[in-house]
Amino acid sequence: MNKTIIINNVSKYIKFKNYYSSSSTILKKKTSEIYKIKGLDIKDRKELYSLNNDSIKKKLNQLKDETNQLLKERGEELMKDLSKTLNLTSDNLKYNITKSPFTLRAYLLAANQGISFYHHELRKQINPTDDYERQKRKDLVYKLQSQEIDSLTSGGANKKKSPFLEDNNNKKSMSIEREMEIIREQQQEQQHFDQQMSNSTKWEMSQLEIQPRIDTFRQDELFVSFNPYESMSTNSQSYQLVSRLSKFVWNKELTNWEMFSSSKLNQLIPQLQLHILDKINLNNDNDNDNSIIINQFLESIKFISNEINSTDLNIFKTLNSSNNNNNSSENIIEVENGGDFKKIINNSIVDSLIYMKGHHFRITSDPFILFFQQLKENQDYFTSNEDYKQFLEKLLDTLLFETIEFDPTSTTTINGNRQFEYKLKLDLLQREAFRQFKVYQVFNTSPDAKRHEESDLRKLAHLCKTLQKRSTSDFIQESKKYLSPQILSNGLLNSNKLLVATSSSNELNQSKTSISISQLTDGLHSCIPATMSLLEFSIKNSSKDNILFDTFDGKLKNINSLDDLITKFANSKYIYLRESLSQRFSMFIQSSNNTTDNNTTTDTNDNDIIIGLNNPIYKLLIDLEDKVLELSQNNFEENPIENWIGCLSIELGDEDDNIEYKDTDQFNVIASQNFNLVRINNQMLAQLHKTFSEDLDFQIEELELMIKNKKILEREIKAHNEKISKIIKDSRDSTTPTFYFIGIQDDQVYTLEIPNEWEPVWNLLKSYPNGLLLKDFIDKQTFVTKEAFLSTLTDLNKYGVVGLFPKN
C-alpha cells in the first residue's frame, strides 16, 4: 500500500527500484527532501486581533526562531533547491530569504507555483524590429536597389528586370514604376520606424530601459524580472513575487471600472509584503522599537483586510481625496509608521488608475483575448471582483499562518505538465500575444496590418490548440516552427533544457536558446564598444603565428566568435551581480581563468573556465571606457554652471594666438572640472582605445573600394591586421605607469597622455579652485623650460583641460 501512495504506477516503481531497495527507504528519502515552514502559531486574523503586544511579540519571535533553525540545519540545501527553481543565484537568495520569515514564505509559495525569475537583460524586449513582415519588405527594397546599382554600373547594357520576382512559369516581372513605389513606401516607413524606435525600449547609458514606462509592470505576467540595476537594499523581488501570487481579474467584457478596482486590489498584499512583512525584525533589546513594529504590523494587516473588502463608495472617496493630492505610492519609499503605510495604499489608487488607462486596450485586444482563454479560471485568474476578494483573503492567511511545504522534486501537475513547464509554455504564448499587440496596435509599422495580423493570429491559435492537446516537447517544436527565436529568448536560464532542440549537439548553441545574446551584445557595445571590438578582432585573428591571447595556440577554448564569449558571460554568476554591465563583464573576464562558476543557476563544468583572458589590458580598457561613459552621462545631464570654465575660457588656436612668457602676467589659469588626471600602468592604452574606437569594418570596406586587384587587396588587408595586432601585443606587454588627462569638451571625449611630472603640477593647479596668475603658476614648476611648459599649457587649453582668462 505504501508503494501505491509514493509511486503512482508500476513503471515509476521499476524506475526507482534500482536506487532504493524498499518502500521504507523511498519514504525516508522523499520525506527528507520536503521543507516544512510553519506560519504564525495563530489560528486566523480574528485571533491575531485579540492578542496584546506581548503575545504577538512572542508569536513573531517563535516564528523567527523556527525559521532560523530551519536555515541553520538545511539553509544551504534549501538555497540550492530554490536557486534552481527560481532561477536566482544563492547569494541573491541568501540576502533576501533571511530578511524576514515572511520573505522566505513568499519565495516558497512562488516556487510551489512554478514562478521563476527571468533576467531583465537576457529577455528579448519587444520593439519595432519585431515586425517581421517589415524586415521582409526591407529585404525586398535592398534587392531592388542593389539591382538598380548593378544596372547603372553595367552601363545599361542589360534591360532592367526583377528576376528574383519571376517564377519558372514566366509570370510578369515587377514593373519599374512599382519598384520605385515600393522604395518610396519603404522610405516613408523608415521614417515612422525610426520615430517608434526612439520611443521604444533601448540601451541608455549601459542600462536597458523599458519604454514606455507603463510596460515595466504587467499584473498578468507569469514570471518575475530580475533587474541588476536595482540596489540590493531596496530591491522589490518579493513585491513582484507576491504580485504574481495575487493573480488578477479578467473577462472578455472587462470594463474600465472593473479593471481599475481589481488593479487596486492586486497591489494590496504585495505592498504589505514589501513595506511591512519583509521588515519584521524585532529587536529584543529595545521594547520601544518592538512596540512600534508590532503596532505597525497589526494595524497594517487590519487596514489591508478592510481594503480588500472596501466598498465602491469608499473608493470614490479615496479618488476624490487623491484628486487634491496627486501622489503615487512610489513617492513614499520607507515606511516609518502605520500612517505612512496607509498613505502608500491610498496613493496607490493613482497607480491603479494609470495602470487601467495604460493596459485596458491591451488586455481586451484580440491576441490577449486568445491568450487569456488558455488560462484556468479561478486558478490563473478570476472573472469577478467578488471571487477575487475571497482569493486574496485566503492568500493573506496563507502568508501569515499556514504551514508551507516545498518539495523540489514534486510532480504536482496541471494537465500532465509540471507547474514551471505549464507557465513556460503560457509565457511563450503571452510573449507572442504581446508582440502582435505592440506591432499591430502600437507601432503601426505595417502598411497591410490587417492581413498580417490575421495570419499571425491564426498561428497563435494553432499554438494554443497545441498547448491543450499535445505534449510539452511537441508544443516546443511547434513554437520553434511558428515563433521567432526572439520570442523563445525569455531570459529564463532554467528553461534551456526544455527549449533546446533534441538534435542540437552544440553545447553553446543550447545554452543561448533562452537568452537574447544579440540584446546583451548591444548593451555591451553601448558601454564598452572598444573592448568589444578588441575582443572580436582578437578572436578572429589570433593564431599560433599571431598570438593575441595567453594560450599556446593563441585560441580561446570553445570560443570561436564574440557571441560564444558573451554566451559564456550570460550563463555565469556575474550576470546576476548588482553592478554596472561593464563591471560585471570585467569581473567575468578577470575570473574566467581560475574560477568555476559554482554559484550559477545552470550546470557548470570545466568548459566554463576560459583560459587566456588573464591579461590586465581588458580591465584597464573597460575602466577607461567606464570613465568615458560617466563623463558622457554627466555632460548629457550638464548644468551649464558646472562647465563654466570650458564655456568662458579663451581658446588658443593658431600659433599667432599663442601666449609668450612675457605676457603671462596678463592671464589667469584655472583647472577644468571636466577633466581628471588618471594614472594607468600601461603607456599604450590611449592608442589601443583610439584604434578600437574606430570602425575597423569600414576601414576594410574602404580598402575593398579602392583596390580592385585581389592579391594586392589581400596583402593590404593582411598588413592592416598585422598593424593592429602589433598594437594589441604592445599594449598587452606594457606595464609602464602613464598619466592621462581624461575628460570631455564640446561633446567630445579626450584621452590625452601627459608626462608623469605633471602629477604634482596638476595637483597644484587644482589646489587653486579659483585660479591663479599664469606667470606664478609657470614659475612654480622646474622640470622643463618655461617656454616648453607654456606650449604644453597652450595645447591643454585647446582641449579644454585648462581655462585661460585675460586679467582685468
Swiss-Prot record:
Domain of life of the source: Eukaryota
Positions of region (Disordered): 152-171
Keyword flag Ligase: no
Gene Ontology CC terms: mitochondrion
Coiled coil: 43-78, 694-733
Location(s), subcellular: Mitochondrion
Disruption phenotype: Mutants have no defect in cAMP signaling or motility, but are unable to respond to a spatial gradient with directed movement.
Record-given protein name: Protein tortoise
Origin organism lineage: Eukaryota, Amoebozoa, Evosea, Eumycetozoa, Dictyostelia
Gene name for this UniProt entry: torA
